[in-house]
C-alpha cells in the first residue's frame, strides 16, 4: 500500500454560480471555495492552471492571431471558392479540422471554427503544442515538466480519448498503484452548457454522473492508497447568452477594407483588431465606442488582468462584450449558442470553483494557484510513498506556501 494519492480532477465550466447551491460532492469534498478565473477562454484558463502563471507570463491566450508571415494555412485559401453554405457547416469544418491538424502535426487543441477561408492565410494558430504534455507551453514549463524533472510517476488525461476511456485508464493505474499523482480533465459539461445554458435541467444529472465517477475512482484508489487527497475544480463558469450583436456588420460598414486597412478576429465574446494603416485605429475605435453592448479594454486594465501583450501579438485593440452578449456571426461560429464564457473575469458567471476534502489555504484565490496545490501534494506524496531511511513516515504539517 502507498500512503497518499493526490487526485486532481478538472470539470470544465463547472463555475461557482452553477455549482454553489447544488449537492455536488458535498459529502466527498465538503470544503468549497470560489476562485477568480483569468481573462480569456479555456485556451488560457487551462494553461494558467497547469503552469501556475498568468496569460502575460505563459503567452497562451487566444487561438488565432494576425501573423501572415508564419501562417500555416495558405494552402487552404482555395476553399474560399466553395459555397459558404457548405464551408460554414459545422460537420464540414470538423472534418477539415481533423485533416489539417494531422497534416500540420499540431499536438494541442485545434479547430478551424468559422475563420473565413478568404483570409485564413493572414492568421497563425497559437496552440501548436499541448499544455497537457511536458514542454507544451508557449513559454515556460507546466506541472508535467515539473513532475518529469523529479521523476514522479503520474497520470494525465489524453484529450484525444473520451471521458469514459480516460476514466478507465486512470482506474487501471489506481488498481496497479503505479502512480503518485493524477490529473483528470473532463470537458463534457462545457459542451452541454454551451448547448442548453447554465440553468437547464440537464445539468443536475451530468453532475450526478461525475460524482458517481469520482466516488468510483476514490474507491478503486482505496485498494492501493491509504488516503486520497481529492481536488475537483473548474477553469471558468458559463453565462447564458440572451442578446446577439453582429459586430462584423458594424465594422464592415466602415470605409475600410479587411486585410488592407485592418485585420480582426471575432471571437465569441470579444473582438481583437490589428491596424495596417495610419488613422485606421481611430476610425474603428470611434465606431466601437457607439456599441453599447460592450467596451474597449484599455492597456491599463489588460495589465491589471495580466493579459497585456506589449508586442500586440494577440491584438492591438480588444473589444469585450458585456456578460450575456454574444457576437453572431463570429469567427467561432455562424449561429448562436445558448451560453458562453470568456467575459470579464469579475462578471458574476465567470468565477471558477474548487471542491476538496482538504483544508484550502487562504492564499488559494485564483485558478493559477491550483498549480501550487498540485506541486505541494505531489511532493508530499513522493515523500510519503517512497520514504528514504532518514525520513519518518508520518505526514508533515499540511501547509501551503503563499503564492
Task: Say what each PLM segment does.
Residues 1-41:
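Active-site-proximal N-terminal segment of extracellular/periplasmic enzymes that hydrolyze or transfer
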Residues 5-7, 179-183, 229:
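Residue-level preference for the first positions of well-ordered beta-strands
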Residues 7-11, 16, 209-250:
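Metal-dependent active-site segment of extracytoplasmic phospho-/sulfohydrolases and closely related
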Residues 32-53, 160-161:
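Short, solvent-exposed turn/loop segments enriched in Gly/Ser/Thr/Pro and often Arg
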Residues 53-197, 206-209, 289-293, 371-385, ...:
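His/Asp/Glu-rich, glycine-adjacent segments
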Residues 227, 238-275:
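Acidic/histidine-rich catalytic neighborhood
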Residues 262-381, 403:
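Active-site neighborhoods of enzymes that stabilize oxyanions during catalysis
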Residues 383-403:
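Short, basic, low-complexity termini and linkers enriched in Ser/Thr/Gly/Pro
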Amino acid at each position: 500500500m502507498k500512503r497518499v494519492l493526490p487526485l486532481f480532477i478538472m470539470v470544465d465550466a463547472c463555475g461557482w454560480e452553477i455549482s454553489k447551491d447544488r449537492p455536488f460532492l458535498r459529502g466527498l469534498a465538503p470544503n468549497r471555495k470560489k476562485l477568480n478565473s483569468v481573462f480569456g477562454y479555456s485556451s488560457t484558463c487551462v494553461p494558467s492552471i497547469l503552469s501556475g502563471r498568468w496569460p502575460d507570463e505563459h503567452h497562451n491566450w487566444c487561438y488565432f492571431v494576425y501573423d501572415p508571415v508564419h501562417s500555416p494555412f495558405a494552402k487552404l485559401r482555395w476553399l474560399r471558392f466553395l459555397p459558404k453554405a457548405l464551408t460554414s457547416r459545422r460537420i464540414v469544418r470538423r472534418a477539415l479540422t481533423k485533416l489539417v491538424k494531422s497534416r500540420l502535426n499540431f499536438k494541442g487543441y485545434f479547430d478551424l471554427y468559422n475563420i473565413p477561408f478568404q483570409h485564413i492565410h493572414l492568421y497563425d494558430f497559437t496552440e501548436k503544442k499541448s499544455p497537457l504534455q511536458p514542454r507544451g507551453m508557449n513559454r515556460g514549463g507546466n506541472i508535467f515538466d515539473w513532475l518529469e524533472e523529479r521523476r514522479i510517476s503520474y497520470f494525465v488525461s489524453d484529450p484525444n480519448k473520451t471521458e469514459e476511456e480516460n476514466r478507465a485508464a486512470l482506474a487501471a493505474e489506481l488498481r496497479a498503484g503505479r502512480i503518485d499523482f493524477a490529473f483528470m480533465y473532463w470537458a463534457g459539461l462545457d459542451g452541454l452548457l454551451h448547448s442548453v445554458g447554465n440553468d437547464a435541467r440537464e445539468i443536475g444529472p451530468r453532475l450526478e454522473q461525475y460524482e458517481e465517477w469520482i466516488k468510483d475512482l476514490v474507491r478503486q484508489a482505496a485498494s492501493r492508497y491509504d488516503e486520497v487527497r481529492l481536488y475537483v475544480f473548474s477553469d471558468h463558469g458559463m453565462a447564458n447568452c440572451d442578446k446577439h450583436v453582429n459586430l462584423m456588420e458594424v465594422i464592415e460598414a466602415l470605409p475600410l477594407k479587411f486585410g488592407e486597412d485592418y485585420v480582426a478576429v471575432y471571437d465569441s465574446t470579444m473582438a481583437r483588431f490589428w491596424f495596417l494603416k495610419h488613422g485606421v485605429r481611430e476610425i474603428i475605435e470611434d465606431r466601437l465606442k457607439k456599441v453599447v453592448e460592450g467596451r474597449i479594454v484599455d492597456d491599463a486594465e489588460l495589465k491589471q488582468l495580466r493579459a497585456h501583450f506589449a508586442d500586440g501579438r494577440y491584438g492591438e485593440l480588444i473589444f469585450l462584450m458585456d456578460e450575456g452578449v454574444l457576437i453572431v456571426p463570429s469567427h467561432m461560429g455562424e449561429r448562436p449558442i445558448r451560453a458562453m464564457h470568456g467575459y470579464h473575469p469579475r462578471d458574476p458567471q465567470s468565477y471558477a470553483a474548487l471542491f476538496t476534502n482538504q483544508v484550502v489555504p487562504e492564499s488559494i484565490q485564483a485558478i493559477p494557484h491550483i498549480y501550487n496545490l498540485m506541486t505541494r501534494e505531489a511532493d508530499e506524496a513522493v515523500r510519503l510513498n517512497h520514504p528514504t531511511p532518514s525520513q519518518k513516515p508520518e505526514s508533515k504539517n499540511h501547509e501551503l506556501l503563499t503564492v
